[in-house]
Amino acid sequence: MPDDDIKASLRAAFQGRVLDDADALAPHLTDYRKRWTGRTLALAQPDSTEDVAKLVHWCRERRVAIYPQGGNTGLVGGSVPDGDGHSIVLSLARMNAILDVDRYNNTLTAQAGAVLANVQEAAAQADRLFPLSLGAEGSCTLGGNLATNAGGIQVLRYGNARDLCLGLEVVTPDGQIWNGLRGLRKDNTGYDLKQLFIGAEGTLGIITAATVKLYPRPAAQMTAFAAVPDPQSAVQLLSLAQSYLSASLTAFELISGPAVELVLQHTPGARSPVPAKAPYYVLLESSDAESAAHATERFEALMEAAFEADIVTDAAIASTLAQSASFWQIRHHLPEAQSIDGENIKHDISLPISRIGEFIDAAQTAVHGVLPNARIFVFGHVGDGNLHYNVSTPPGADASAYQAMRNSEKAISGAVYDVVARMNGSISAEHGVGQLRVGSIGRYKPANEMAMMASIKRLFDPLGLFNPGRVIAAD
């Protein structure tokens, strides 16, 4: 069937929920980093799970691919269509309702298009905490967070999106609706099917709603910004913090000195919490269920022990919420500062925590072997072994230097990933595979593991219509 006939049929079947003019499509065809731009027949905006199922049936009959999309905030090109054009983008933006908050069961159920910040606010209104927190929380969606198994800054205490999910509602590639929205913490009646869809990036099913865990809101919070001489000292500080704070340690971020300097350079009003420059910094936070006095006592004891052990060279403890927010501003503005500064090659990797210092040294040697003058910015959630290892050109680089870096991207990423693999790490910690890494994962996963993944994809989606070319390379 010609594309114009397909679009006419789509508009007739889903009146008022289909757009195909260029201006409406444009924001949905290019990814957040403006690295990938695709084509599509139309943008579908269903209002309900039943609409999604009907749309899947319609696409299946006509062999039209579907690219599910939440907030389109991903960093690996996972939610924008390819250049083929014989597809639709399925936006879940209209399906954004908070369906239920059960403060006694400590659960919340929401549609997949609910913005993460709105989910957090709904929990707060019930005097509860939904702890998934990341830089894009004002625009990313719950469905997208689950589809990519998002991490964020509090994984150390609460886990990834996968760990926070109790149930899902999913439309499968055959157009069936699976309602698994059970708010149970124990259910031993067979396979835990929801785990197949979490982190699958919409390749096995379209998440339409989810039931997630809530937690009591903490009575007090403590935040510190500490200077450390090297990454190994940061790892030692993490171990010390876990001893002193136990489960109340909620965040532990490592930021390299050059990364902090970049934020101070490009972010108006940003100030370093400590006066002297250092090679590395740690941003750590604890949440206490008892009282502010109890939290302060434990936190100050930790920092005193860290100074005595020569792990920390300088530190500031936030005395107000505003001061804590200013500490976090350094961390949250890093991606924006890098964008202002110029292009960079991003890596989202995870490692055994004990090998983080070793990795940073080895990866720097490997990268400089490919691009000798490259600047390297290191930051990330060291408490769970996740580093963002980004490579850029020297300050003041001209167009030829950026082109040289672009030309070397495959070699640079290969050098970084080879070091990750030697240390039993992962080339994708929290951002997903998308288009960026779909060609790389086969090199770093066992062949039988890739074969099992491909078998699962064929079982669920034999026609290959759900987010093709993501996670598993398209046939």
Where are these regions (language model features)?
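N-terminal flexible segment immediately upstream of the FAD-binding catalytic core
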Residues: 1-57, 74-106, 259-271, 321-345, ...
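Short, ordered loop/turn segments at secondary-structure junctions
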Residues: 23, 70-72, 135, 257, ...
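FAD-binding subdomain of flavoenzyme oxidoreductases
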Residues: 97-253, 466
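Short acidic/histidine-rich active-site segments
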Residues: 426-433, 468-470
